[in-house]
Every structure is written in C-alpha cells, then in structure tokens.
Amino acid sequence: MSNTLKWNDATVDYGLLEKVNPVFNTAKMTLFQLAANGNTDAAALVRDMGLTLEATQNSATTKASPEQVLGGTIMLEIRYRTMARLAEESGDTLVDLPCGYTPRAIEFAKKGLAYYGLDLPAVIQEAAEKIPALIPPEQKKLVRFRAVDATNYTSLEKALEDVDGPVCITTEGLLMYFTDSEAGTLCDNIRRILEKKGGCWYLADVECSLQYVIVMRAGGRPVHGNHEECFPAG
C-alpha cells in the first residue's frame, strides 16, 4: 500500500508526517494497544487500517522494549476506561480532543450518545473514513469529526458551533507535545469554550508520568488479552 494518500485534492505523506509531528504515530500506537487489550472495536479498526505491532510501537528513531510496551498498554487502558466513564456520567456532549483513532466514537454511538472527535487534519481524514464504517447506520448521525488547531480559539469554536448545550471535553496524550506557551493557550481556549457552552474538562496528561512509573514499578502483571488472541494468524 502506498505511503501517500490523496484526499480531496490534498496529498499527505505519512512517513514525513511522523517525522515532523509524532502525535500522528502516537494515535495509531494507542489504537493498537487498545486492540491488544481485547477491545473488539479497536481490533476491527486495526485490521481495516492494516496496522502492525512493529509499525505502531516503534519509529525510525526509537524502539520500545517489551516491558515498555506492556507498561504503556496497562496505563493506556486504565486511562481510556476512566475518561470514558467520566465523560458518560457527565451527561454532556463528549468532545474528544484529541480523538485519534480510538473506538470511543463507536462505543458512544452504540449507546445513543453524541460524540465530537477533534484532531489534526491528517488524523481526521482517516478517522472520518474508517470509524463511521463500524457504526450502525441509524447511529452515524451521532458522530462528528472535525479538524482543528487546538491552539486557535476560532478553530475550536467553529468545530463546536452546532453543539447545543454543555460539553464534556476529554484530553489524553496531548500536552506533552506542546510548549508551555501552547499549553497555556490551549487552557485559555478551553476556558472560553466552557464559559460559552458550559460543561467540564477532564485532562489526564498531568498525571501521565506518575501513572507510568507506578505501572512499571508494579511490573510483570498480565494485561487483558494479547496480540495473538486479538489478531490470529490468517
């Protein structure tokens, strides 16, 4: 399969994109880890997108050890489930920022809950094509994907202009890629969105390093499922 995708007269070189923006490859790594943990919707997306362990857990410059993959996978599942539970219990429209390729849109749609996935244009191009295909036809209208610049308030405001009522914004795996100035701008933008629409913001990133250390110190405990069970030969 070509490493270049043409979409609406735009050409995206995904190999180059990983070099200049590591967030892109991290999104696919997250999806693969969720699939390895036994998430069937994530596994379906992984197969549809043709992702592999080697391609998603490593890059041209780094290679993760089995222990690092295991620790990251455990931490990811804890965070993913916690954020989903908080968002669902809020009763507000979920705004996943960044949404990546996770199957949360599928899970919320199946429950009849509205979902807005916001991310970089290149991620949205793929997510908006692959994810709705796994959502029952009568529930597709609950899911919307929007390309945004999280450091630009106008971009966020426009992406959410058709949301009626309060929002629950969830953020996982984003701030570590921002400078202090960019992180401050994001916080200001989220504050303005919440002042306008009401709701809440759940941010997992501030405890990410501590969670990883705790998981790695626990060491050697099995996760739910494994790569062979999720992706049998053939």
Features from the language model and the residues they span:
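Short, surface-exposed basic-aromatic patches at helix termini and helix-loop junctions that form
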Residues: 108-110, 160-162, 188-195
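Conserved beta-strand signature within the Rossmann-like core of class I S-adenosyl-L-methionine
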Residues: 168, 187, 192-210
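Short alpha-helix
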Residues: 226-234
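Short, well-ordered secondary-structure micro-motifs
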Residues: 156-158, 213-215
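Short SAM/SAH-binding signature in class I
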Residues: 160-176
